[in-house]
Curated annotation (Swiss-Prot):
Organism: Wigglesworthia glossinidia brevipalpis
Site description Could be important for selectivity toward long polyamines, residues in chain: 86
UniProt-listed InterPro entries: Acyl_CoA_acyltransferase (IPR016181), GNAT_dom (IPR000182)
Reactions accelerated catalytically: an alkane-alpha,omega-diamine + acetyl-CoA = an N-acetylalkane-alpha,omega-diamine + CoA + H(+); spermidine + acetyl-CoA = N(1)-acetylspermidine + CoA + H(+); spermidine + acetyl-CoA = N(8)-acetylspermidine + CoA + H(+); spermine + acetyl-CoA = N(1)-acetylspermine + CoA + H(+)
A Gene Ontology biological process term: spermidine catabolic process
Location (main, coarse): cytoplasm
Residues where spermine binds: 31, 36, 44, 52-55, 86-88
Protein's recorded name: Spermidine N(1)-acetyltransferase
Length: 174
């Protein structure tokens, strides 16, 4: 797999990684942008792992930098007929602002388009998450639209922006 930042790599999520994922899941500032309830019990996480380990409509990767776990990338809702999937990423707050999100996103997009032969990746991002939107635009994502009051988080409904990138556009850029 192509590496865009030295020593950054994606590898499949393993059972041994669940403690790291559990720490991210229990960080309210991280989960706010995933529009999910924080404070998931570890047993719930292991049950989800067991349920989805052989699910061909999902791929989950640990982002590593020099053998340190710095985040998680997910390709979910993979549809092999329409050749599309939803992209999701979490960077551990201790590693944010160091370029890992850009590099990991490039690696994940490359995997989706070169290995899975998908045509389109899409995502939804909180409209207030300007850093993420900037990264996605930089990598060739385009804005498809705005979803009004799409998620309830921290006591209020949040608007999100739906963005996508197409295989040919990404391949032409990189």
């Amino acid at each position: 797999m192509v590496q865009y930042l030295k020593k950054i790599k994606l590898r499949p999520l393993e059972r041994d990684d669940l403690t790291f994922i559990h720490q991210l899941d229990n960080n309210a500032s991280v989960m706010r942008y995933w529009f999910e309830e924080p404070y998931e019990a570890f047993v719930e996480l292991t049950d989800l792992y067991d349920k989805h380990i052989h699910d061909q409509s999902e791929r989950r990767f640990i982002i590593e930098y020099s053998s340190y776990k710095v985040g998680l990338v997910e390709l979910v809702e993979i549809n092999y007929i329409h050749r599309r999937a939803e992209f999701q990423i979490i960077i551990d707050p201790n590693y944010q602002g160091k370029g890992y999100a850009v590099s990991a996103t490039k690696l994940a997009i490359n995997y989706a388009f070169s290995i899975l032969n998908l045509y389109k990746l899409y995502l939804v991002v909180d409209e207030s998450n300007e850093k993420a939107i900037h990264i996605y635009l930089k990598l060739g994502f385009i804005i498809e639209g705005r979803l009004i009051h799409e998620f309830f988080s921290n006591g209020k409904y949040r608007d999100v922006i739906r963005m996508c990138v197409f295989q040919n556009n990404f391949n032409n850029k990189y």
